Amino acid sequence: MRIALGIEYDGSGYFGWQRQAEVDSVQGQLERALSIVANEPIGLFCAGRTDAGVHATGQVVHFDTNAIRNEGAWTLGVNANLPDNIAVRWVKEVDDSFHARFSATARRYRYVIYNHSFRPGILRHGVSHYHGNIDADKMHQAAQVLLGEQDFTSFRAVQCQSKTPFRNVHCVNVTRQGMYVIVDIAANAFLHHMVRNIVGSLLEIGLGNQPLTWMGDLLALKDRNQAAATAKPHGLYLVDVTYPEQYQLPKLALGPLFMLD
């Protein structure tokens, strides 16, 4: 039996999604909880591996099991065995053709900037604080050059293991909600650190340090060293993963919960 789960988590206390020896990871905690409920070892596959400090409201995973449980038993049982900063949002049995990573047709991230003179207290791990005067409209305008299938070498991490730097960005929007600036971006897939590297460069434009045309210049240069520093991890959320309709996976509010949808 193959089971898909929708997961949300606060990534600030973990060394990323991927299971690693001797450090705490989201995957490790989920596999431990699932193995208790299934009464057998469980291995997980995810839609997107998030880095240390990065959060998710719409992560999707799947696993195979011999255990027979109803959806409520999986949800309640796993949540009861998880730490408070990880939660199962939904459970659905899927056919064997489904794969959390390879069946996905798009991923969507939101990067939340707290734009204020002083740092936040309550949301300090859920937003990235930048105190300069950020022009979100300029960031949005500059970001439109990223649309379509392009070579994103200038925005990939040096350690990125992808065989190709080409990705297809479906949409990118930058909006302001009071003190928050939100970068909302969807693509077929993302390179390692791609979203945070894009945000870092857009911030340079929003702060007035670079012209509107800079994003296009960076794309053409195909040189990571010419782009801005990688934006902080705390403001980044994996909010949605798109799959073919045949799987009929649940659709929930994207989040994060303190943002307007």
Curated annotation (Swiss-Prot):
It is an enzyme of class 5 (isomerase). Substrate binds at Y109. One of its GO terms (biological process) is tRNA pseudouridine synthesis. The active site is at D51. It holds the Pfam family PseudoU_synth_1. Signal peptide: none annotated. GO terms for molecular function: RNA binding; tRNA pseudouridine(38-40) synthase activity. Keywords: Isomerase, tRNA processing. It catalyses: uridine(38/39/40) in tRNA = pseudouridine(38/39/40) in tRNA. Its EC number is 5.4.99.12. Homodimer. NCBIfam families: hisT_truA (TIGR00071). Formation of pseudouridine at positions 38, 39 and 40 in the anticodon stem and loop of transfer RNAs. Belongs to the tRNA pseudouridine synthase TruA family. This is tRNA pseudouridine synthase A. It comes from Shewanella putrefaciens (strain CN-32 / ATCC BAA-453). The lineage of its organism: Bacteria, Pseudomonadati, Pseudomonadota, Gammaproteobacteria, Alteromonadales. The gene is truA.
